């Protein structure tokens, strides 16, 4: 089965940025107009978009709503959104506005009942982001690290009814060091839920390696690509062709 590639738009103060290891003071601005960037990704052939409200992740509430709404207006492809979404009202509001899938991160750790409630209310629309630092789950925009192993959290979510898990290796995020495929594949092998790899994609080889891993672990469903696209290290057409190869 083909992998899904999700170009990433991370929003900080209304602009499209990339961070290094989630550090807000290590932000590089790549586009002042996130909606235009979303259109560029869609025109390149991508079929889904990953958007994170970085300010929202730290504030615990949506902050870049205007930019998200502009993205939704600009593109027809499905958009998944995370960052600062912490309750049913927020989830429902974004889905009503046209968000395809809502990503719960800190809320999933601190309020597991919310995940089950949301997944029951919005089947196929809820994703959980498991962000790991040295194998342990991090929350609050990665500012806090828990004592909960990422794989254990994934196993707890096995029967929650969610659509997918995004597994991010914080140490590699934005660093162009390659996916931590060992950790991601181990997590995926422990569950049946589709798993999306994130953090560190540096080149076409990462997609090739992920495809090989998916042959062994079929619920590896795709990957999120950020800095490598913005820096021109990955050609979109080549990446999409590699992801679709059997």
From Swiss-Prot:
It is found in: Cytoplasm. Keywords: Amino-acid biosynthesis, Cytoplasm, Histidine biosynthesis, Isomerase. PANTHER family: 1-(5-PHOSPHORIBOSYL)-5-[(5-PHOSPHORIBOSYLAMINO)METHYLIDENEAMINO] IMIDAZOLE-4-CARBOXAMIDE ISOMERASE. One of its GO terms (cellular component) is cytoplasm. The gene is hisA. It catalyses: 1-(5-phospho-beta-D-ribosyl)-5-[(5-phospho-beta-D-ribosylamino)methylideneamino]imidazole-4-carboxamide = 5-[(5-phospho-1-deoxy-D-ribulos-1-ylimino)methylamino]-1-(5-phospho-beta-D-ribosyl)imidazole-4-carboxamide. Belongs to the HisA/HisF family. InterPro entries: Aldolase_TIM, His_biosynth, HisA_bact_arch, Isoase_HisA-like, Isoase_HisA-like_bact, RibuloseP-bd_barrel. One of its GO terms (molecular function) is 1-(5-phosphoribosyl)-5-[(5-phosphoribosylamino)methylideneamino]imidazole-4-carboxamide isomerase activity. Its EC number is 5.3.1.16. Pathway: Amino-acid biosynthesis; L-histidine biosynthesis; L-histidine from 5-phospho-alpha-D-ribose 1-diphosphate: step 4/9. This is 1-(5-phosphoribosyl)-5-[(5-phosphoribosylamino)methylideneamino] imidazole-4-carboxamide isomerase. The active site is at residues 10, 131. One of its GO terms (biological process) is L-histidine biosynthetic process. It is an enzyme of class 5 (isomerase).
């Amino acid at each position: 089965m083909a992998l899904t590639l999700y170009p990433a738009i991370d929003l900080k103060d209304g602009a499209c940025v990339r961070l290094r290891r989630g550090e807000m003071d290590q932000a590089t601005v790549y586009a002042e107009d996130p909606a235009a960037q979303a259109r560029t990704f869609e025109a390149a052939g991508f079929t889904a978009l990953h958007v994170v409200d970085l300010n929202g992740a730290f504030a615990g509430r949506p902050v870049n709503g205007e930019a998200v709404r502009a993205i939704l207006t600009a593109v027809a492809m499905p958009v998944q959104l995370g960052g600062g979404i912490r309750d049913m009202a927020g989830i429902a509001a974004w889905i009503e506005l046209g968000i395809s899938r809502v990503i719960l991160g800190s809320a999933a750790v601190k309020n597991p009942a919310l995940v089950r409630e949301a997944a029951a209310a919005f089947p196929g629309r809820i994703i959980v982001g498991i962000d790991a630092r040295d194998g342990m789950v991090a929350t609050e925009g990665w500012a806090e690290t828990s004592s909960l192993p990422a794989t254990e959290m994934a196993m707890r979510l096995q029967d929650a009814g969610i659509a997918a898990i995004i597994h991010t290796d914080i140490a590699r995020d934005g660093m162009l060091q390659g996916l931590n495929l060992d950790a991601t594949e181990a997590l995926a092998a422990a569950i049946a839920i589709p798993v999306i790899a994130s953090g560190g994609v540096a080149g076409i080889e990462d997609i090739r390696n992920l495809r090989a891993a998916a042959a062994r672990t079929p619920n590896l469903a795709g990957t999120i690509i950020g800095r490598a696209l913005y820096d021109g290290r990955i050609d979109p057409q080549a990446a999409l062709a590699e992801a679709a190869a059997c």
